[in-house]
Design a protein with these regions (language model features):
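Proline/glycine-enriched tight loop/beta-turn segments at coil->beta junctions
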Residues: 16-24, 50
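N-terminal cap/lid segment of alpha/beta-hydrolase-fold proteins
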Residues: 1-19
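Short coil/turn segments at secondary-structure junctions
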Residues: 25, 67-74
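Alpha/beta-hydrolase active-site loop
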Residues: 72-92
């Protein structure tokens, strides 16, 4: 699915096959990765009772709007704003404890 923090198109992987979730793990991937890389991790933690959410940073994988790997001048500020937006989305939708990994 896509979320739109500050009109940026950010792809979000959501692995939610949990009947009675204990919490949500929000993954913040590294600079040379994407959220999909954590699929096996997500399936493991789904079996343990956790929903797993990992977005693609702006300019990465499915969040590319212009050039792949493009990092705007204030790129790290943008990443931080996007992650906070996603954390707030998780709080609003799931109302469960969140562990942030990354």
């Amino acid at each position: 699915m896509y979320l739109y923090p500050n009109n940026r198109k950010i792809f979000v992987n959501i692995w939610d096959t949990v009947a009675n979730p204990k919490g949500v793990i929000q993954i913040i991937h590294g600079m040379s990765e994407c959220g999909a890389r954590y699929e096996q991790f997500a399936h493991y933690f789904n079996l343990k009772g956790y929903i797993v959410i990992a977005n693609d940073h702006y300019g990465h994988n499915n969040s590319v709007e212009a050039y792949f790997g493009e990092l705007p001048k204030e790129g790290f500020k943008i990443f931080a704003e996007d992650e906070l937006f996603i954390t707030n989305y998780i709080n609003e939708v799931y109302k469960l404890p969140i562990h942030i990994l990354g």
